[in-house]
UniProtKB/Swiss-Prot annotation:
Protein name as annotated: Large ribosomal subunit protein uL18
Subunit structure, as described in the record: Part of the 50S ribosomal subunit; part of the 5S rRNA/L5/L18/L25 subcomplex. Contacts the 5S and 23S rRNAs.
GO molecular function annotations of the record: 5S rRNA binding; structural constituent of ribosome
Highest taxon listed in the record's lineage: Bacteria
Record-linked InterPro entries: Ribosomal_uL18_bac-type, Ribosomal_uL18_bac/euk
Organism field: Methylococcus capsulatus (strain ATCC 33009 / NCIMB 11132 / Bath)
Keywords of this entry: Ribonucleoprotein, Ribosomal protein, RNA-binding, rRNA-binding
GO cellular component: cytosolic large ribosomal subunit
Family, as annotated: Belongs to the universal ribosomal protein uL18 family.
Gene assigned in the entry: rplR
Purpose of the protein: This is one of the proteins that bind and probably mediate the attachment of the 5S RNA into the large ribosomal subunit, where it forms part of the central protuberance.
GO BP: translation
Amino acid sequence: MDKKQARLKRAAKTRHVIRAMGANRLTVHRTPRHIYAQVISPDGGTVLAAASTLESAIRETLPVTGNKDAAIAVGRRIAEKALAVGISSVAFDRSGFKYHGRVKALAEAAREAGLQF
């Protein structure tokens, strides 16, 4: 089992537990250049809110999109969008990534902006 397969296996376990809870899920995906966040409905079929460093509103304000500052901006943006749709409580799905660095920065920024998890 290589590194990616191990991460995907961890992610599948987490998603199974979150689906059993029946909560909206804040999922995060990171690449070396960008970071993405989505709030997904409990059935797993509908994206209720999404934010990433590919959005022009975020991309124009940052010189680099693959660092903690970018993750903080995406965390604030996803919280704003989720609250605008009426979602205040979510379950955090780190997609098998370690809760460290950019993933942690995004989560903390979303909490500070009003999301509860």
